[in-house]
Design a protein with these regions (language model features):
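Predominantly soluble domains enriched in secretory-pathway, periplasmic, or organellar proteins
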Residues: 1-370
């Protein structure tokens, strides 16, 4: 779920909610809390990295999760590498009418990795979007054929790929007609993405999950999930490498790959299972630590953890006051907890998750309310 945004902060006129199972996006008007519109495309079969909005809410971004033949066509799983693909859809949002305009929307074809969460650049990184991926191994299971199960096959590589996409330039390419229409959606082919220098990869530690851009837009924080670090990518470094075409190689589809060490500002040792990150107005980041069931507070400047607070359950997402905008409010954070462990509120067997309100205004985080 994402609110409408502008360059100042958040414009709370609408929220956009994605449906992971049936790839579609809903527009909810916050003036009356009524769902005004639901749109979807048969281009993709599933999604996860939605809904993220560009600054000024020109577009609502929806990213596929599981690769599939685009447009719902059939291809045997043995043709996974050749026929299966991911995609990212840019739904045009008319702010005056409060509606998505499908005929002004477009998409881009991506390699058949499992694209995950995404975030749009802001301020210095405005015009770019960054998307995590897992399963650069392109595993699809096959135990009966002697192949490793999907979960094992998809975690063989030490690095996956952070997708760095120049969406503003891609918009111009789409408007120039360099697209192919698939299932009614204008789509920039993968080869065109490469030829027009719209897409580059930066290696990121194994099976990452959260990707979150700092309030000033200068850095991209990636939660390791199967790595103990939060990796801080420097937008300035990556942009310079892309402009100078300093790549360490290409992926099997020809997408250029940036050198990892030259792309990052550093790494912060967070703990076991770092996922998502939010920010305050004092230069601190807050990362959910899934396996430890804690929230870690750490300094963006020093890249050192300054404190942790335990949560009820295995924490997944977290949300700070305006914590993903250009001007975070600070003071409060909500831990969104997933699975019941140890002590928990008796809210029934179907919904064991709960939220916790945490005060972040002081030197140490303090639990205010379960």
């Amino acid at each position: 779920m994402r609110k409408r945004q502008d360059h100042r902060a958040t414009n709370a006129g609408f929220i956009f909610v994605n449906d992971k199972c049936n790839p579609r996006v809903a527009v909810v008007d916050l003036h009356d809390f009524v769902t005004k519109q639901i749109v979807g495309s048969e281009l993709i079969a599933s999604e996860h990295g939605a809904t993220f909005v560009t600054p000024d809410t020109d577009y609502v971004v929806e990213t596929s999760q599981y690769p599939a033949p685009l447009g719902g066509a059939y291809a045997p799983i043995e043709q996974f590498n050749e026929k299966y693909r991911g995609a990212m859809i840019f739904w045009r949002f008319d702010k005056e009418k409060g509606r998505i305009v499908p005929e002004e929307s477009w998409a881009m074809e991506l390699p058949p990795y499992m694209q995950d969460l995404a975030d749009c650049g802001k301020k210095v990184s405005d015009g770019w979007v960054f998307c995590n991926s897992i399963n650069t191994e392109r595993a699809y299971g096959g135990i009966l054929e002697g192949k490793p199960p999907l979960e094992s096959g998809a975690t063989q590589n030490d690095m996956d790929y952070l997708h760095c996409i120049h969406w503003r330039k891609a918009e111009a390419v789409a408007k120039a007609g360099k697209t192919t229409t698939i299932a009614g959606m204008r789509t920039i082919p993968l080869q065109t993405m490469i030829d027009e220098n719209l897409l580059a990869f930066a290696p990121e530690p194994k099976s990452p999950h959260g990707v979150d851009i700092t309030p000033d837009g200068s850095a991209i924080v990636v939660g390791g999930k199967l790595d103990t670090h939060a990796t801080v990518f420097s937008f300035a470094k990556m942009r310079a490498l892309i402009d100078q075409k300093k790549f360490e190689g290409k992926d099997p589809y020809g997408v250029p790959i940036l050198p990892f060490k030259d792309s990052i500002r550093g790494q912060c040792e967070i703990g076991l299972g770092p996922l998502h990150t939010q920010f305050d107005n004092q230069g601190f980041a807050y990362t959910s630590v899934f396996i430890e069931s804690k929230v870690a507070k750490w300094s963006l400047k020093d890249m050192k953890v300054v404190g942790k607070i335990p949560t009820h359950y295995n924490i997944g997402h977290l949300s700070a006051a305006e914590g993903d905008t250009v001007s975070p409010d600070g003071k409060y954070l909500v831990a969104m907890n997933k699975w019941a462990i140890d002590r928990f509120a008796d809210v029934g067997p179907l919904l064991p998750q709960n939220f916790q309100l945490i005060d972040t205004s002081g030197e140490n985080m303090e639990l205010l309310y379960d």
